[in-house]
Amino acid sequence: MRHGDISSSPDTVGVAVVNYKMPRLHSKAEVIDNASKIAEIIVGMKQGLPGMDLVVFPEYSTMGIMYDHDEMMATAASIPGEETAIFSAACRQANTWGVFSLTGERHEAHPHKAPYNTLVLINNLGEIVQRYRKCIPWCPIEGWYPGDRTYVCDGPKGMKISLIICDDGNYPEIWRDCAMKGAELIVRCQGYMYPAKEQQVQMSKSMAWANNCYVAVANAAGFDGVYSYFGHSAIIGFDGRTLGECGEEEMGIQYAQLSVSQIRDARANDQSQNHLFKLLHRGYTGMHASGDGDKGVADCPFEFYRTWVLDAQKAQENVEKITRSTVGVAECPVGNLPHGGKEQTAG
């Protein structure tokens, strides 16, 4: 894995991430116009970065955040649809793969259910090869319908790719799920705003290290009239070290080459920090010395995970005992979310 050049090679996947300026849009026509601008950017980037095999745009980069519910429902997209057709054409023209945000994607029961927050991975032939729906929306603010699974597919040059979105990345479980399915590159598209810049930068680096995987983060930049977005799109090596990172600038771009052979060699041959292997072979050194086989322990030692899988309702009740029993909070109500107390006023 290396950083600083504009090339790629048969062994390296050239990955670019974009600090896309958060748009503020209100209509389908504006969304289509913005999608066309993104398509133009892809073609231009390929000219400047001829080795680019994959370009990643942030969450909300296509549609912005529709703070008006009616606008959100009216602009919700179908997949495939007008937006993905524009992106597919750009990927074919530039001979590159791309990750694009659709906020939202129409629910199967549209308009009776909230839309999904969705990413699509499109290959250089213009084909949609992965569609991921955000599993853990940023409640209480985001009103998206949650997805229910992660995916892994072959990306450029055979690199295994998973997609996750923004707040998903605050939960180690989703990273581990992707990695244990074989993901070598986890793409995290964000529309993350201040004040949580330091925490989000740290999280992506830590998860790359903990899961022996590459991470590509694309985050929004700028101000949309409500939130200020901190950028810092980055490409991180499977050892948790940053290869390239943008600042807070609008439309900043970072680029790095990710070796396919290096990550596979590390996963096969690294020992003390091979976290994926060691998690399912716990204590193999001591057990082998004790005459108890050469595989270590595979059983899950974590009671929480066993409970969650076997009795999700009980797991939910258990977490409410150490947090709260209502989704809303009386001291800081959001929308019409139910809470158990009387709203307090400042002063």
Swiss-Prot record:
Family membership noted in the UniProt record: Belongs to the carbon-nitrogen hydrolase superfamily. Aliphatic amidase family.
UniProt protein name: Aliphatic amidase
Keywords for the protein's UniProt record, in alphabetical order: Hydrolase
Active site residues according to the UniProt entry: E59 (proton acceptor), K134 (proton donor), C166 (nucleophile)
Functional summary from the UniProt entry: Catalyzes the hydrolysis of short-chain aliphatic amides to their corresponding organic acids with release of ammonia. Also exhibits in vitro acyl transferase activity, transferring the acyl moiety of short-chain amides to hydroxylamine to form hydroxamates.
GO-annotated molecular function: amidase activity
Tree of life domain: Bacteria
Keyword Hydrolase attributed: yes
Reaction equation(s) it catalyzes: a monocarboxylic acid amide + H2O = a monocarboxylate + NH4(+)
Phylogenetic placement of the source organism: Bacteria, Pseudomonadati, Pseudomonadota, Gammaproteobacteria, Pseudomonadales
Occurrences of domain CN hydrolase (ranges): 13-260
PANTHER family (UniProt xref): ALIPHATIC AMIDASE, NITRILASE C965.09-RELATED
EC number, as in UniProt: 3.5.1.4
Database matches in InterPro entries: Aliph_Amidase/BUP, Aliphatic_amidase, C-N_Hydrolase, C-N_Hydrolase_sf
